[in-house]
């Protein structure tokens, strides 16, 4: 049975809890708390309030070295706490977000010495580049089709017109608009790094649709 003293203590405890303002914590107290957080929670903490953001910028974990200018990359993808960046020099950088702070993978990056380039013909330029991560973490025996902002993955051998596995298929809108090409559908062969133009279809880009039975 609660005594009058117990009720008084409970009221004081509730009053103290209601009066707590976590946004007004002393910076010297808040700073070590923020620095002890994981990488994800650490970056979430800066959105709590303006006071926390001010303290967050003074923490040791605040490091902008891994930040990438959006103008220096073609595309990015995120999977299993790792950020993959396809850079302007055709390399893939990998940043690991599983630790206390993002770290760039060096020796463990299998693509560090493997630039992804293609042989350009005169006046040929591919201006939309994408990076895709397969479920297995590698891209083998697969075909990627880009169009309408959708990427499809299918384990097929050959569907005709030069479209086969180990290739990337793209359509007219993925090319530099002024490029005079014999076809509006291109095939990029991953093994040879060459682009072929099977044939020109007499339709517009918004009329072309891809359909793969069993994968749609």
Curated annotation (Swiss-Prot):
InterPro entries, per database record: F-box-like_dom_sf, F-box_BR-signaling, F-box_dom, KIB1-4_b-propeller
Domain F-box: 19-69
Pfam families, per the entry: Beta-prop_KIB1-4, F-box
Protein name as catalogued: Putative F-box protein At2g03610
């Amino acid at each position: 049975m609660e005594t009058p003293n117990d009720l008084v203590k409970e009221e004081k405890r509730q009053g103290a809890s209601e009066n707590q303002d976590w946004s007004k914590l002393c910076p010297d107290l808040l700073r070590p708390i923020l620095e002890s957080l994981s990488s994800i929670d650490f970056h979430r903490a800066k959105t709590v309030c303006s006071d926390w953001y001010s303290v967050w910028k003074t923490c040791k974990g605040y490091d902008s070295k891994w930040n990438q200018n959006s103008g220096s990359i073609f595309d990015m993808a995120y999977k299993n706490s790792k950020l993959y960046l396809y850079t302007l020099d055709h390399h893939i950088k990998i940043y690991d977000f599983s630790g206390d702070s993002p770290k760039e993978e060096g020796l463990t990056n299998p693509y560090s010495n493997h630039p992804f380039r293609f042989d350009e013909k005169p006046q040929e330029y591919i201006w939309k580049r994408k990076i895709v991560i397969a479920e297995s973490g590698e891209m083998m025996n697969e075909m990627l089709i880009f169009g309408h902002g959708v990427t499809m993955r299918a384990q097929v051998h050959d569907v005709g017109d030069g479209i086969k596995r180990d290739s990337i298929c793209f359509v007219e809108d993925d090319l530099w608009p002024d490029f005079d090409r014999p076809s509006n559908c291109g095939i990029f062969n991953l093994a040879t790094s060459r682009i072929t133009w099977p044939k020109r279809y007499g339709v517009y880009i918004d009329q072309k649709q891809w359909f793969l039975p069993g994968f749609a």
